[in-house]
Swiss-Prot record:
PROSITE patterns on file: ARGE_DAPE_CPG2_1 (PS00758)
Record-linked Pfam families: M20_dimer, Peptidase_M20
E.C. number: 3.4.11.4
Highest classification ranks of the organism: Bacteria, Pseudomonadati, Pseudomonadota, Gammaproteobacteria, Enterobacterales
Protein name: Peptidase T
Length: 408
């Protein structure tokens, strides 16, 4: 465990933010730097079959150290950090033996406060790693990477019985491309776990069904003084569309297993307007109903428009709820829960109000629930991780490997 913090601080020192709307994968050069660093470290540790694809997926194998027909399992984390907040020149602060109250984030007015983040009350006495208030931290998912790398070292150094352990580090998870170029056959694991969750004990095997909705509105612009019966204001049509979307089914009004419609962006002029929504729901039937609702709204608002003016709606599914795939293999969750209990952790099964690489991989034939990392408040300057949480994650990964080796 002595190198866990060192590894984490090393990884977050690299700016690995991904970038949306870029064709190339990985979308940024910084991700390549971390991938090459990890490749070198895996090779130095003596792992075999270390490969780095042209699309930035790094894979390696820790060979089994016991005989028998033990299923190969995998652990996966992503190298990119969120584009939502700067990841350049990350300057972590280490707060040992947290005693409560506000934590000043660097020099300035930014604080990490238990008033805004009550979970801090549960972390008294622990070592917190925070930002300096200017960037994100990168615990999502450099913490997961550091934990996997440390778990590999522990398995080797302590000669803990295990079967083949596959590891993979993927790019562009934060922009939805992490699993797109993942070669499940080459990975050759019976099942896997992403290490990309939050607080200690979290075990996630349910996520949203997700779709994007892009709406193009073409209007007609003339001088306002002579506009009667001629002007078709695309912005007004956009406002009417959004007024038809249920206001109480937005992200800020929902929680738990509740789905939502989210207007992510809207821009335009009288002549042309564009709207971008995302749709989320855990239930597949409700998910399909939400997509139909958007089509009905567009049809209603667009009824009776001049033929040269129109509303065009394009819906594209992004990913689906991995529950329907993971529950077909209950032992995957049983092993993870047992591993946590063996490490004095009470498992907390909760839905992901988002998605992970594991969601897509589960539908590609690799069942892949999500393990905790010990991090909180991802994608922003209030992000932090606890060293104790990271150590627990390492223990759970090691124990999962050990328990799997007992399933002969």
């Amino acid at each position: 465990m002595d190198k866990l913090l060192e590894r984490f601080l090393n990884y977050v020192s690299l700016d690995t933010q991904s970038k949306a709307g870029v064709r190339q994968v990985p979308s940024t050069e910084g991700q390549w730097k971390l991938l090459h660093l990890l490749k070198e470290q895996l090779e130095e540790m003596g792992l075999i079959n270390v490969t780095l694809s042209e699309k930035g997926t790094l894979m390696a194998t820790l060979p089994a150290n016991v005989p028998g027909d033990i299923p190969a399992i995998g652990f996966i984390s992503h190298v990119d950090t969120s584009p939502d907040c700067s990841g350049k020149n990350v300057n972590p602060q280490i707060v040992e033996n947290y005693r409560g109250g506000d934590i000043a984030l660097g020099i300035g007015d930014e604080v990490l406060s238990p008033v805004m983040f009550p979970v801090l009350h549960q972390l008294l006495g622990q070592t917190l790693i925070t930002t300096d208030g200017k960037t994100l931290l990168g615990a999502d998912d450099q913490a997961g990477i550091a934990e996997i790398m440390t778990a590999l070292a522990v398995l080797q150094q302590k000669n803990i019985p295990h079967g083949d352990i596959r590891v993979a580090f993927t790019p562009d998870e934060e922009v939805g491309k992490g699993a797109k170029h993942f070669d499940v056959d080459a990975f050759d694991a019976r099942w896997a776990y992403t290490v990309d969750g939050g607080g200690v004990g979290e075990l996630e095997f349910e996520n949203f069904n997700a779709a994007s909705v892009n709406i193009k509105i073409v209007g007609n612009n003339v001088h306002p003084g002579t506009a009667k019966g001629v002007m078709v204001n695309a912005l007004s049509l956009a406002a009417r569309i959004h007024a038809e979307v249920p206001a109480d089914e937005s992200p800020e009004m929902t929680e738990g297993y509740e789905g939502f419609y989210h207007l992510a962006s809207m821009k335009g002029t009288v002549e042309r307007a564009d709207m971008h929504y995302i749709i989320r729901d855990f239930d597949r039937k409700q998910f399909e109903a939400r997509k139909r609702k958007m089509m009905e709204i567009a049809k209603k608002v667009g009824k009776g428009l001049h033929p040269d003016c129109y509303i065009e709606l394009v819906i594209e599914d992004s990913y689906y709820n991995m529950r329907e795939k993971v529950v077909e293999h209950p032992h995957i969750l049983d092993i993870a829960q047992q591993a946590m209990r063996d490490c004095d952790i009470e498992p907390e099964l909760k839905p992901i109000r988002g998605g992970t690489d594991g969601a897509q991989l589960s539908f590609m034939g690799l069942p892949c629930p999500n393990l905790f990392t010990g991090g909180y408040n991802y994608h922003g300057k209030h992000e932090f991780v606890t060293l104790e949480g990271m150590e627990k994650a390492v223990q759970v990964i090691v124990r999962i490997a050990e328990l799997t080796a007992q399933r002969k």
